């Protein structure tokens, strides 16, 4: 009888040991490195991503001089990180009443985007780009109503873009010369995220 009690105790101990070993091995499987979800790589340009509220100044450059034409508040520029060294810049439409002695009373442009703008992430993210894109402009002559003037599409408008993003601040200068316009139009944006 003692022998049966001894064997029963031995069987119970072996069962408990096996069960705890099984639980321990299941627990190891759940936390092993083979089951971890890989972390996504964070792009160096990701810190610049976001929406910046800016003031847009509009001017025209001619004969080495710059003449201010107008400005618009609360222009939202959206910046998206594309790669470690490129971003996209999305510019909203604008509609600016012009000031000064100029033969036009209003300037407007539909929204547009610049893709693959190369960035130099060096503490201050500096960027520059020269492209040709389709732009849609409206220039209202001084003696006409804005609603009577259609927008015109210019398929290969040369655009020059340069600027910086530092911390939560952005500064962008865009120069565009649509169609047969004799002088380039310059937009200066300054704002914060």
Task: Name what the model sees in each region.
Residues 68-156:
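Predominantly extracellular/secreted and cell-surface proteins with exposed
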Residues 2-6, 18-51, 176-193:
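Bacterial Sec-dependent N-terminal signal peptides
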Residues 131, 135-193:
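Extracytoplasmic electrostatic interaction patches
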Residues 22-25, 54, 61, 68, ...:
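Intrinsically disordered, low-complexity, compositionally biased regions/tails
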Residues 11-17:
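Hydrophobic helical h-region of N-terminal Sec-dependent signal peptides
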């Amino acid at each position: 009888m003692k022998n049966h009690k001894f064997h029963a105790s031995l069987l119970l101990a072996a069962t408990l040991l096996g069960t705890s070993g099984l639980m321990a091995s299941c627990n190891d499987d759940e936390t092993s490195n083979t089951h971890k979800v890989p972390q996504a790589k964070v792009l160096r340009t990701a810190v610049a991503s976001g929406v910046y509220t800016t003031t847009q100044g509009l001017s025209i450059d001619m004969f080495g001089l710059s003449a201010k034409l107008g400005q618009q508040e609360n222009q939202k520029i959206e910046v998206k990180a594309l790669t470690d060294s490129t971003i996209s810049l999305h510019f909203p439409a604008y509609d600016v009443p012009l000031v000064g002695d100029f033969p036009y009373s209003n300037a407007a442009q539909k929204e547009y985007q610049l893709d693959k703008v190369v960035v130099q992430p060096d503490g201050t993210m500096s960027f520059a780009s020269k492209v040709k894109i389709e732009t849609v402009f409206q220039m209202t002559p001084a003696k006409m109503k804005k609603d009577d003037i259609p927008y015109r599409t210019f398929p290969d408008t040369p655009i020059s873009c340069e600027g910086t993003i530092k911390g939560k601040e952005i500064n962008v200068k865009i120069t565009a010369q649509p169609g047969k316009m004799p002088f380039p139009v310059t937009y200066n944006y300054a704002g914060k995220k």
